[in-house]
Amino acid sequence: MVNEQKRFALFLATSDSTFVKKAYGGYFNVFVSTFGEDGEQWDLFRVIDGEFPDDKDLDKYDGFVISGSLNDAFGDDDWIVKLCSLCQKLDDMKKKVLGICFGHQILSRIKGGKVGRASRGLDMGLRSITMVTDAVKPGGYFGSQIPKSLAIIKCHQDEVLELPESATLLAYSDKYNVEMCSYGNHLLGIQGHPEYNKEILFEIIDRVVNLKLMEQDFADKAKATMENAEPDRKQWQTLCKNFLKGRSEQV
């Protein structure tokens, strides 16, 4: 019996920058190269531009990924409200949904959590987050051994301020109480960016500085976090793939 091709969808909640288009061909390629594997089908829906799958097609997918965004997850833009409605349907269907940054906050919003401006302000750079090892089940998407901490690239000004009762806190940091959380076995939110690398982060920082939206001193400090350290990208990649594809390889 031949296994059916797995099918996933990316809900892109941001526009491709000129740099990302030139260097990677767009954010879709960044996500697929991070979370995708040979033999899979990945579809792109630019939700920020109003592109959404038909309800009748949702069951054809094995999982979904919601990207980061410059927009507020607590906003009432038409496309954000529609995305929330879609995610509620996926939750009811118990479909796997991985939320990254803005996507993480969207998942909390639809489950009844509180999302807003980060209480300790904008965060950019490499950060270490601590796992709540008691909350993580061995043999799940972390594998048999749970790491005490993992480094990840951060780039956000909003956060999950209060988790809903249905959430399980999986990770926190010295600056934010909610760095990663799950809802049942089918929704997973990560505040950081497993898909980012140093090149992508630095270009975003430079662009924000040029727009006069960030002080140079703050930008320099953000870049300095990656002078002698790197994100645990392979571990995050394994974790996210395990979650989306129902595996338990060691992170």
UniProtKB/Swiss-Prot annotation:
The gene is GGP5. Residues 17-214 form the Glutamine amidotransferase type-1 domain. GO terms for molecular function: peptidase activity. The lineage of its organism: Eukaryota, Viridiplantae, Streptophyta, Embryophyta, Tracheophyta. This is Gamma-glutamyl peptidase 5. Belongs to the peptidase C26 family. One of its GO terms (cellular component) is cytosol. Gene3D superfamilies: 3.40.50.880. Its main location: cytoplasm. It is found in: Cytoplasm, Cytosol. It holds the Pfam family GATase. It comes from Arabidopsis thaliana (Mouse-ear cress). The keyword Protease applies. The keyword Protease applies.
